[in-house]
Amino acid sequence: MAFFTGLWGPFTCVSRVLSHHCFSTTGSLSAIQKMTRVRVVDNSALGNSPYHRAPRCIHVYKKNGVGKVGDQILLAIKGQKKKALIVGHCMPGPRMTPRFDSNNVVLIEDNGNPVGTRIKTPIPTSLRKREGEYSKVLAIAQNFV
């Protein structure tokens, strides 16, 4: 038995390391960053027609590279590059801000006008604070959370 415990002695730390997570599980992994799959929630033709690959974020227009509600991102959708506005994400935020089941975006043009005419899901009321920037997106929203 002593031989058995002596044999596994150097490997106990290896098994201990392998049993724990060897990767980071921080909150930033749940926010929207590069290569995050998103869901388009407006009724634009580009966002509604089926495609074999989900839209992905390829750039976040922020210095730290992590997008939250109200930030602009660049999407790769059906072989095209389109700008989008984040209207909901899975990451828990500060108090009294909703957490969504999916990463929701609304397609916008380069000047900030929305591509679609309706938003199908509720959007957070925290976007109303930034009303000057996204007033046209708020105008086509039906529900607020």
Swiss-Prot record:
Family: Belongs to the universal ribosomal protein uL14 family.
Protein name: Large ribosomal subunit protein uL14m
GO molecular function, one term: RNA binding
GO cellular component terms attached to this protein's record: mitochondrial inner membrane; mitochondrial large ribosomal subunit; mitochondrion
Record function comment: Forms part of 2 intersubunit bridges in the assembled ribosome. Upon binding to MALSU1 intersubunit bridge formation is blocked, preventing ribosome formation and repressing translation.
Subcellular location: Mitochondrion
Chief location bin: mitochondrion
Domain of life: Eukaryota
Assembly and oligomerization: Component of the mitochondrial large ribosomal subunit (mt-LSU). Mature mammalian 55S mitochondrial ribosomes consist of a small (28S) and a large (39S) subunit. The 28S small subunit contains a 12S ribosomal RNA (12S mt-rRNA) and 30 different proteins. The 39S large subunit contains a 16S rRNA (16S mt-rRNA), a copy of mitochondrial valine transfer RNA (mt-tRNA(Val)), which plays an integral structural role, and 52 different proteins. Interacts with MALSU1.
Transmembrane regions listed in the UniProt entry: none
Organism: Homo sapiens (Human)
GO biological process: mitochondrial translation
Keywords annotated in UniProt: Mitochondrion, Ribonucleoprotein, Ribosomal protein, Transit peptide
Organelle targeting peptide span: 1-30
